[in-house]
């Protein structure tokens, strides 16, 4: 499959002590091939039931292309959790911390009773996902499913234990000796 093959070839860089893999799905570089994006979307569509979903929710920035593609396939609108405040009525600020960054995220466009699927590119520490889940619960949304394309580290387990929500992933990886390894 293209996703796994492309992961095996992607470069790994250091961000402080964090080994950061650089991949089209997670970083938009070096090049996002339509066939790779299509494969990822089709694989998500096979494992997530969108039939009772009102909105697809993703975090800025690297979930946007995933949510856009899924929205085009399903005709379900999507909401982007942004890194800056717009000051709109009902905006929900939420703090998130990852393995290499931290800061505020802002949720807009979610109403009480909305049925949502959360889509993200990668889950590694779980910090962003926990923040998103907490914000959506505060807004009164019903989380129908959660899917992350790439799983790395213990983030999925941490989120599931802390929130009670199961997270689906397409591929699990690790970084060993400066290379991505498929598990």
From Swiss-Prot:
SUPFAM superfamilies: PRTase-like (SSF53271). This is Hypoxanthine/guanine phosphoribosyltransferase. GO terms for molecular function: guanine phosphoribosyltransferase activity; hypoxanthine phosphoribosyltransferase activity. Homodimer. CDD domains: PRTases_typeI. It catalyses: IMP + diphosphate = hypoxanthine + 5-phospho-alpha-D-ribose 1-diphosphate; GMP + diphosphate = guanine + 5-phospho-alpha-D-ribose 1-diphosphate. Catalyzes a salvage reaction resulting in the formation of IMP that is energically less costly than de novo synthesis. Pathway: Purine metabolism; IMP biosynthesis via salvage pathway; IMP from hypoxanthine: step 1/1. It holds the Pfam family Pribosyltran. InterPro entries: HGPRTase-like (IPR026597), PRibTrfase_dom (IPR000836), PRTase-like (IPR029057), Pur/Pyrimidine_PRTase (IPR050118). Keywords: Cytoplasm, Glycosyltransferase, Purine salvage, Transferase. Its EC number is 2.4.2.8. Its main location: cytoplasm. One of its GO terms (cellular component) is cytoplasm. It comes from Methanocaldococcus infernus (strain DSM 11812 / JCM 15783 / ME). Belongs to the purine/pyrimidine phosphoribosyltransferase family. Archaeal HPRT subfamily. The keyword Glycosyltransferase applies. The keyword Cytoplasm applies. It is found in: Cytoplasm. One of its GO terms (biological process) is purine ribonucleoside salvage. It is an enzyme of class 2 (transferase). PANTHER family: HYPOXANTHINE/GUANINE PHOSPHORIBOSYLTRANSFERASE (PTHR43864), XANTHINE PHOSPHORIBOSYLTRANSFERASE (PTHR43864:SF1).
């Amino acid at each position: 499959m293209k996703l796994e093959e492309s992961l095996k070839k992607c470069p790994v860089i250091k961000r402080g002590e964090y080994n950061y893999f650089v991949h089209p799905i997670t970083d938009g570089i070096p090049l996002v091939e339509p066939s790779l994006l299509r494969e990822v979307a089709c694989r998500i569509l096979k494992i997530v039931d969108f039939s009772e979903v009102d909105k697809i929710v993703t975090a800025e920035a690297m979930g946007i292309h995933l949510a856009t593609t899924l929205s085009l396939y399903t005709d379900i609108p999507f909401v982007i959790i942004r890194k800056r405040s717009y000051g709109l009525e009902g905006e929900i600020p939420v703090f998130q911390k990852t393995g290499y960054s931290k800061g505020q995220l802002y949720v807009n466009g979610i109403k009480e009773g909305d049925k949502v699927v959360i889509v993200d590119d990668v889950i590694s520490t779980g910090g962003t996902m926990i923040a998103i889940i907490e914000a959506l619960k505060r807004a009164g949304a019903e989380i129908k499913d959660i899917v992350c394309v790439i799983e790395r580290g213990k983030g999925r387990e941490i989120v599931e234990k802390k929130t009670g929500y199961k997270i689906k992933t397409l591929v699990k990886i690790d970084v060993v000796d400066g290379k991505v390894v498929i598990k």
